[in-house]
Amino acid sequence: SRGLGDVYKRQVNQQRKLLRIAGGTKFIFTIHDFNFLTEKKPWKAKMYLRRMQNKVNKAAVVTTISHYVADVIRQHIDLKGKEIRVIYNGVERIDMLEGTQPSFATGRPFFFTIGQIRRKKNFHLLVDVMRHFPEYDLYICGDAHFAYAEEVRNLIREKQVTNVFLTDVITQSEKIWLYRNCEAFLFPSEREGFGLPVVEAMQFGKAVFAANRTSLPEVCNGHAIMWEHLDTESMV
């Protein structure tokens, strides 16, 4: 434990106030990302940043999930001389598990992507990309209750693209089937603290195409085709 003695470790939402901890208790604080800086209103982002600084001030150890996030921490947080320890996210082995074919699968060859349907994921870029691959379908899967999801649906309708399907949330077994049977995994996300889906896709030996942004070059580590420019001409 490198002289830390007994250390208290529990999952704490990085934006919430620090829970009351017994005096003298050492604890580890893990920072996952700084998405709030671009996703929240300025006053709220400042509040979250103050809360994060308060936790760092009191933490015995600060950890994070990628060297990319570690660099962002150094830009926005006074570490008080503390070291940041990078501990990559653990990834469950799912490639040996059974999958279930989703009811929406058409039987045609397909590409796959997954994640919350939020603007930072850049799923709208894939609509135009798929116009260049009429012989393939694309399944965009994930929590679609965000306003951006409706923008993607509208774009699909406006451009009359018939081979892109925004499916909403899927089960674990459906996800496994899609990873196992897709022709390639596409991940044009603009901001990731880690990027778990690209690692999951690699478990199945799939070709991964990902944005050369934030943590993704680090996590893909030369095992993916990286999109340098996020425009249709460059991505196809």
Language model features: what each stretch is:
Residues S1-V236:
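Carbohydrate transferase catalytic cores enriched for Leloir-type hexosyltransferases
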